[in-house]
A protein has these predicted regions:
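A short glycine-rich beta-strand->turn/loop micro-motif centered on a GG-aromatic cluster
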Residues: 6, 87-92
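Signal peptide-proximal N-terminal region
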Residues: 76-88
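A short, gly/pro- and small-residue-rich
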Residues: 123-131
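Short, glycine-/small- and polar/acidic-enriched structural segments
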Residues: 131-137
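Exported/periplasmic ABC-transporter solute-binding proteins
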Residues: 22-75, 94, 101, 113-114, ...
Length: 286
């Protein structure tokens, strides 16, 4: 009997010592420091993962004539959305249309004509509800600054006064507008004989600015940003459809919510003012 009591007493003592040791370890400063370090590491990892999740790259495909204005708008947007990277592809609207059709990364498309946007939408490649008519531009005839070329109208380009005229090719909206204008004037055959075809409107602008062409046909906004050219005149009234710039979200956008936020930014008064500073006519309305 005494042995049993002695054994029970010994067992209780062992349990008590073990419990005390555990309690002592829980208060050990080195143990707490390890636990705190682990918590901080886990918190840092969570914050890093959250930060990575917020970083987004939006691919904006836009007509070449929008290069300067969208570059300024992008700077403004970055101030308000530092987590968003805007990556632009500027080219002719026809080239950009082909890129979207072939599956190139694209979140937002801004065309220099309705034709390309409508064709993409008919193929089911655009979010139809997101498409808006954003801007209007003017088609103008230009010559190099200080040029003595004696022309005053689109009709004069067909005369012997002009040896080479720079125009956009057939898949470039400004080239399509040019063809329509001269077909309506009954002068398209004469123009083709002296035409030098460019891949986009900025190439037309460059050829005239560097005097590699006598004259050229561009948008008013392009002429406004190039000091080495001057506007001769606007296209004859009624000679072509208005140069409307539609914008919309690509159906397969990887980031449709962020693309919508960028589209909403284009609708603000702040951005409207920037567009107008570059001589665009802002036509969007709710």
């Amino acid at each position: 009997m005494r042995r049993k009591k002695w054994f029970v007493a010994l067992l209780c003592a062992v349990v008590g010592i073990t419990a005390a040791a555990c309690e002592g370890n829980s208060d050990d400063p080195s143990t707490k420091e390890v636990e705190n370090t682990q918590e901080r590491t886990q918190q840092s990892e969570r914050e890093t993962e959250e930060g990575k999740a917020e970083e987004v790259e939006l691919h904006i495909l836009a007509a070449a004539s929008m290069t300067d204005v969208l570059t300024e708008i992008a700077d403004k947007y970055k101030e308000e959305h530092p987590e968003i990277t805007l990556t632009f592809s500027f080219d002719s609207s026809g080239t950009l249309q082909t890129q979207i059709e072939e599956g190139a990364p694209a979140d937002v498309f801004i065309s220099a004509a309705l034709k390309q946007m409508n064709e993409l939408n008919e193929q089911g490649l655009m979010d139809e509800d997101s498409i808006i008519e954003l801007l209007e531009n003017k088609v103008v005839l230009i010559k190099s600054k200080g040029s003595e070329l004696d022309i005053a109208s689109f009709e004069d380009v067909a005369s012997d006064k002009v040896t080479m005229a720079a125009i956009g090719n057939s898949d470039v909206p400004v080239g399509q507008y040019t063809q329509t204008i001269y077909e309506n004037l009954g002068l398209w055959d004469q123009i083709q004989e002296k035409a030098n075809y460019a891949t986009n409107v900025r190439q037309v602008l460059d050829w005239v600015a560097t005097k590699n062409a006598d004259c050229g046909i561009v948008y008013a906004t392009d002429a406004a940003i190039e000091p080495e050219v001057e506007i001769v005149c606007e296209a004859p009234e009624g000679s072509c459809m208005p140069a409307i710039y539609p914008a919309g979200i690509v159906k397969d956008s990887e980031y449709p919510e962020q693309a919508k936020e960028f589209m909403d930014f284009l609708k603000t008064d702040e951005v409207k003012e920037i567009f107008e500073n570059y001589q665009f006519t802002y036509i969007y309305s709710e």
